[in-house]
Amino acid sequence: MGVIDMVLFWVLLVNALLIVDASSRNMPFAYQNEMQRHCSSTKYTSLCVQNLREFRHGSLDGLDFVSFLVNKTISDSNLLIPPLSSSMGSSKLVSLEDSTYTLPSPSVSDSCERLMKMSTRRLRQAMEALNGSSRKRHTKHDVQTWLSAAMTFQQACKDSILDSGGSSSASAISHISQKMDHLSRLVSNSLTLVDTIMKNPKPKTKSTALPRWVTAGERRLLVGRARAHVVVAKDGSGDYRTVMEAVTAAHGNGKDLTVIVGDDSATGGTSVPDTATMTVTGDGFIARDIGIKNIAGPRGHQAIALSITSDQSVLYRCSISGYQDTLYAAALRQFYRECDIYGTIDFIFGNAAAVFQSCNIFLRRPHGVKAYNVILANGRTDQRQNTGFALHSCRIRTDSDLSPVKHKYSSYLGRPWRKYSRAIVMESYIDDAIAEGGWAGWLDSGDEVLKTLYFGEFKNYGPKARISKRVTWEGFHSIGFEEANYFSVVKRRNGEDVTNGFKYKFKIKIQI
């Protein structure tokens, strides 16, 4: 760099600092005070202050601060990944500085672009909910859910690039990862402000049979009884003499008869998300009495049966069957009632706010001598995300292939996929196939994660439900009634379950 260039550089730097200092001095004291107060509670305080210094509306409303931060995240997301031209020979991911890095393959680029569009969609939902009259139509839980999902999709984009490994340059991977981390920090700060500023709605005293967002037609679909099409009578007066004859003749009317089947797996070179037999993205998805299988088998490694990124989704009396990574409960609010879920390693994974109520959880025989089973692998990356998994009134048991040899393999309730992983098991039956410690660590994640995770149990029963034998991690909790109620779908009165048949509320602080 020449002398003139050096002098010019320092002149520009000093001017920039003077402008920043002047902008701070020109801010009203009340605004500066509010900005500092709110930002002091965030994880990335300096970034929060830096962003809010750009806010020129002079509002002291904390929600306007949040709205500005969310809008900033949207703007930076759009700068990071513009629409990719399908005619390009190689896909490009554009940085915030407009320099380009070639991604390893079009499939990785397409996946990342899709995830970032999903992230931006949820950011826009949160933005709309924070603006003016919309604030009355949406709750704090809604905004937390959409911001949490936006961060989850950003992390998934980063993961897809990191998993591409040696096919991309180290500099490209590092550069793009840093940009994703920048976006996640912006969302983290927004989540913190939402958590500290917004108020929860007052609980309604009237109990509702189904979530408030389920329509009248959907209620009838879920709780209604089907009209009889055939009659079974031993004396021959009906359509069939035995139940088995009627079942055999049926063309599909239940989770074992109407089944969607796939066999993609990671061993065939397919990316893990793309192995899914069925992928659901539309909000308000409802499934009843249907089966979804991935039959790649235990040698197929990761092979998803069902992947869901649908907000306010409900699955009732469904069967979800696979081995490793069976159910990808990726993001947003999900509820599973009376479902059968089969698998081996991390077979319920993702970062949704998902509750599994009165479900059968079947452990299968894993492949390999040193193989083991893990049910829950939650991917919560920020302590302000309102995500996590809860098993409530479930039965954890072995499938027929594992039962004869279940003591040859270790099986666990869950393990921490991410730093702030959260999982609860309550009022559930725990088979003796589960290890006494109950929970497992994540490979080489270290001791720090054992402090930041949140695993809890409440009033479980069965041969391996003894809390006294559980892991002694700082992040493991034997929770009481109040904490259990916090994670329950159905709230109780005076310790009594107020459920009546298929009735539930879709509102917990993992916030369903």
From Swiss-Prot:
Secretion signal span: 1-24
Disulfide bonds: C339-C359
Residue numbers binding substrate: Q302, R415, W417
Provenance organism: Arabidopsis thaliana
Pathway in which the depicted protein is active: Glycan metabolism; pectin degradation; 2-dehydro-3-deoxy-D-gluconate from pectin: step 1/5
Function of the protein: Acts in the modification of cell walls via demethylesterification of cell wall pectin.
Tissue distribution: Expressed in siliques.
Localization, UniProt: Secreted, Cell wall
Transmembrane regions listed in the UniProt entry: none
Catalyzed reactions: [(1->4)-alpha-D-galacturonosyl methyl ester](n) + n H2O = [(1->4)-alpha-D-galacturonosyl](n) + n methanol + n H(+)
Protein name: Probable pectinesterase/pectinesterase inhibitor 54
Enzyme active site: D325 (proton donor), D346 (nucleophile)
CDD domains reported for this sequence: PMEI-like_3
PROSITE patterns: PECTINESTERASE_2 (PS00503)
A Gene Ontology cellular-component term: extracellular region
Site keyed Transition state stabilizer: positions: Q324
Note: The PMEI region may act as an autoinhibitory domain and prevent untimely PME activity during transport.
